[in-house]
Amino acid sequence: MKIGVIAIQGAVSEHVDALRRALAERGVEAEVVEIKHKGIVPECSGIVIPGGESTTLCRLLAREGIGEEIKEAAARGVPVLGTCAGLIVLAKEGDRQVEKTGQELLGIMDTRVNRNAFGRQRDSFEAELDVVILDSPFTGVFIRAPGIISCGPGVRVLSRLEDMIIAAEQGNVLALAFHPELTDDLRIHQYFLNKVLSC
């Protein structure tokens, strides 16, 4: 089994490390690979789109042909996790700022996103979050974080902060406004692995 982390931009090594630790906790053998070019996504049983700069990320995904591969994989039921900028990339629709920058969103999740819902880089913060899929609060690390303004009927809201949706899932696709990979808490990566292992 192979799990891929999109490695063209963003917090890549942290996700790779978190996934490897989560797999080790379970005693499951799987390869965690960095995806830097076309052709690797179709081999993966799970895909992670990390945080970073969403405009750059969207452009590189389109240019490298990786974006189309992610769309095809998600349509086949392959679990996909997007964090921070990854939440934006997965969305069907963006706010005016997203439209202005001409970002090519993948449209995998029936969501409309606010690109800088929680401010810019200097407004980074941590918050204790109630997340539906977890039995106790999770420390969310927010860095120039986006948020989900609205979502379609097929989307399950997992967490909110200040009336903004910050975590949601739609079938095999999971999107988070925060960075679970920047904490030692592996529960969200374990939840994602549950999806991967049950496919």
Curated annotation (Swiss-Prot):
InterPro entries: Class_I_gatase-like, PdxT/SNO, PdxT/SNO_CS. Pfam families: SNO. It comes from the Archaea. The active site is at C84, H179, E181. It catalyses: aldehydo-D-ribose 5-phosphate + D-glyceraldehyde 3-phosphate + L-glutamine = pyridoxal 5'-phosphate + L-glutamate + phosphate + 3 H2O + H(+); L-glutamine + H2O = L-glutamate + NH4(+). Its EC number is 4.3.3.6, 3.5.1.2. Pathway: Cofactor biosynthesis; pyridoxal 5'-phosphate biosynthesis. GO terms for cellular component: cytosol; glutaminase complex. One of its GO terms (molecular function) is pyridoxal 5'-phosphate synthase (glutamine hydrolysing) activity. L-glutamine binds at G52, E53, S54, R115, I143, R144. SUPFAM superfamilies: Class I glutamine amidotransferase-like (SSF52317). Belongs to the glutaminase PdxT/SNO family. Catalyzes the hydrolysis of glutamine to glutamate and ammonia as part of the biosynthesis of pyridoxal 5'-phosphate. The resulting ammonia molecule is channeled to the active site of PdxS. In the presence of PdxS, forms a dodecamer of heterodimers. Only shows activity in the heterodimer. This is Pyridoxal 5'-phosphate synthase subunit PdxT. It comes from Methanosarcina acetivorans (strain ATCC 35395 / DSM 2834 / JCM 12185 / C2A). The lineage of its organism: Archaea, Methanobacteriati, Methanobacteriota, Stenosarchaea group, Methanomicrobia.
